[in-house]
Amino acid sequence: MKLHEYQAKMLFAQYGIPIPKGLVCTTPNEAKESIAVIGYGPWIVKCQVHAGGRGKSGGVRIVRSKEEIQEFAKQWFGKHLITEQTNHIGQPVSKILVEAAIDIAQELYLGCLVDRSNQCIKFIASIQGGIDIENIAKEKPHLLHQIILDPLIGPQLYQSRDLAFKIGLSSKKQINQFNKIFMGLATLFLEKDLVMAEINPLVITRLGDLICLDGKLHVDSNALFRQPELCKMLDPSQEDKCETYAKQHNLNYIALNGNIGCLVNGAGLAMSTIDMVKFYGGEPANFLDVGGRVTQEKVTKAFQIILSDKKVKVILVNIFGGIVCCDVIAKGIINARLESGINIPVIVRLEGNNAKQGIQHLVNSILNIRIATNLTTAAKQAVALVEGKQCLF
């Protein structure tokens, strides 16, 4: 789960990480009057969306008057901000953060993430930060310095000092400030079950102080049950509507960019199905795991979600019935087909618990449903149908 910048900064403040004075606003008039609380300008106004690259798309601006703040707010409230990290629709803007502008001497970078490849928590710091950090990582990897954080013993001051020296901090004042920021960010990361925390840029002001100008936090969605306060920070407007709808019905759905819809039981089998589709030259439209305790109604909901993606040309159903009853799945497929009225090809592979009964239900339905005897055949058929080829298998 992603958090907005203003939410991240609220948490930063709770953990002793310095941030600029600011106010989050929900109306143009509120934005205009925010400077009475913030103080003298100039100010920075920022659209709050779950995407990077806001500055390059006009979603971040420096302003010097009430009127400019109000103009910016009127321009963006109720609109969609499109950046290099969003789709062509963009993300809706319903909040704007107004902050005191900071006189910057240097931009640094500090981040923490779960490194799944190496099965560890990794801190990364760089002497160069800002909007081009991705390019720096690609073109100047020697500027990125890393340490491993052990969750069992927590962050250590010697690790903080090591990073501070590597990114060029030398004065006692700055090293002490960096230590406080490092320890605060690491503690926040561990206590709030984060998978990514980023301060970019972490700036040195003209007065030599360190302050966090922008921040990103991603929470482990699997740990939200023990983070009730973070659950309240979810902004559904920033989420994929299909994914939100799926969560409400206890379905694990992730939208992809292809045109072959997939309905599978079990995350491992779902990933194998996606791999098989890709292997034979197709592009999956989604990951969808209906789980073990699936009902006829749940299958119908799953079909509705898949069909809401207008790119989908074929639906591939791959069910291995253990706990799941294949005849229940079959009845759900038939109901979904009749309710939707959409006549795109559906390929079904059923194995296991009540598979014969399920297949018989599908055959008797006289609908445009093809039966596959194995996953290889099912994937080949799906790809062939998308490409407009005749299925010979």
From Swiss-Prot:
Gene Ontology cellular component annotations, sorted alphabetically: cytosol; succinate-CoA ligase complex
Keywords: ATP-binding, Ligase, Magnesium, Metal-binding, Nucleotide-binding, Tricarboxylic acid cycle
Binding site for Mg(2+): N200, D214
Matching PROSITE patterns: ATP_GRASP, SUCCINYL_COA_LIG_3
Pathway: Carbohydrate metabolism; tricarboxylic acid cycle; succinate from succinyl-CoA (ligase route): step 1/1
Cofactor(s) the protein requires to work: Mg(2+)
Family, as annotated: Belongs to the succinate/malate CoA ligase beta subunit family.
Protein name: Succinate--CoA ligase [ADP-forming] subunit beta
Underlying gene: sucC
